[in-house]
Design a protein with these regions (language model features):
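The feature captures the beta-strand-to-loop junction immediately N-terminal to the Walker
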Residues: 12-14
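Catalytic Walker B motif of ABC-type/P-loop ATPase nucleotide-binding domains
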Residues: 136-140
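Helix-to-loop junction immediately C-terminal to a conserved catalytic motif
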Residues: 26-28
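ABC ATPase NBD Q-loop/coupling interface
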Residues: 34-49, 151
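C-terminal portion of ABC ATPase nucleotide-binding domains
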Residues: 155, 177-223
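ABC ATPase nucleotide-binding domain helical subdomain, centered on the C-loop/LSGGQ "ABC signature"
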Residues: 36, 44, 69-110, 155, ...
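ABC-fold ATPase nucleotide-binding domain signature/coupling loops
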Residues: 2, 32, 94-123, 141, ...
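A short, proline-enriched helix->beta-strand linker immediately N-terminal to the Walker B motif
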Residues: 130-134
């Protein structure tokens, strides 16, 4: 499959279908024989260079013991407040930070404020946005969010990455419904590919998962 700039791609399938494994190949966590970026074999690209362009937000977000500011910048002294505020807004985390005792300087993690699962997920996404990648891969990192927050966050991401590449891995069909392209995996293979409406009509695994999961937000159905 190919992913072009400006495209939102959803990866879905049953548990252990190969979604996360495919995402890991794009970052050279495992060796792949046929992945190219701008027609260049990723095996010929330095890992540090590759990971400066492609950022991956894992299922279990990593929060550092330090301030919100430190978590956004990876403890870098080069802090850009405008970028920080934009990242927090896109990730739907800005209001949470405003309510914290010291704002961006609030200490979180083992030595400070304990964050909920949803807050941890949104902070990890804000950190990725702050790093300004060409490709953002989010691996089932929205599971703790309520439907409205998730919907708004995804729309923010799609707008922000309208000239880049956004890839979201999700077992929850509602998360990626309405994306430009959706790939359905089963047992390590791509079995379906297309937009939501096409896949729904195909009566394949995508359609089956829709029926099993039953509910889609009305806003996403309209897409």
């Amino acid at each position: 499959f190919e992913v072009s700039k400006g495209v939102s791609l959803g990866l879905t399938g049953k548990t252990a279908s190969g979604k996360s494994a495919l995402a890991s190949l794009m970052l050279k966590f495992n060796r792949a024989e046929n992945i190219y970026i701008n027609e260049v074999d990723i095996n010929l690209i330095n890992k540090n260079s590759l990971r400066s362009k492609i950022l991956y937000v894992p299922q279990e977000p990593i929060i550092f013991s330090g301030s919100i500011r430190d978590n956004l910048t990876f403890f870098s002294k080069n802090f850009n407040n405008n970028k920080a505020q934009e990242s927090l807004y896109i990730s739907k985390f800005s209001k949470d930070v405003e309510l914290m005792p010291d704002g961006l300087d609030t200490i979180v993690g083992e030595r400070g404020l304990s964050l909920s699962g949803g807050q941890r997920q949104r902070l990890s996404i804000a950190r990725a946005i702050y790093q300004n990648p060409e490709v953002l891969i989010i691996d089932d990192t929205l599971s703790s969010l309520d439907v409205d927050t998730e919907l708004s966050l995804i729309e923010n991401l799609k707008n922000h990455f309208s000239k880049k590449i956004l890839i979201i891995v999700s077992s929850r069909i509602s998360t990626i419904y309405g994306f430009d392209n959706i790939i359905v995996l089963d047992k390590g293979s791509i079995i379906e590919e297309g937009d939501s409406k096409t896949l729904t009509k195909n009566n394949g695994l995508f359609s089956e998962l829709l029926k099993v999961q039953k509910i889609l937000p009305k806003e996403k159905v309209r897409n």
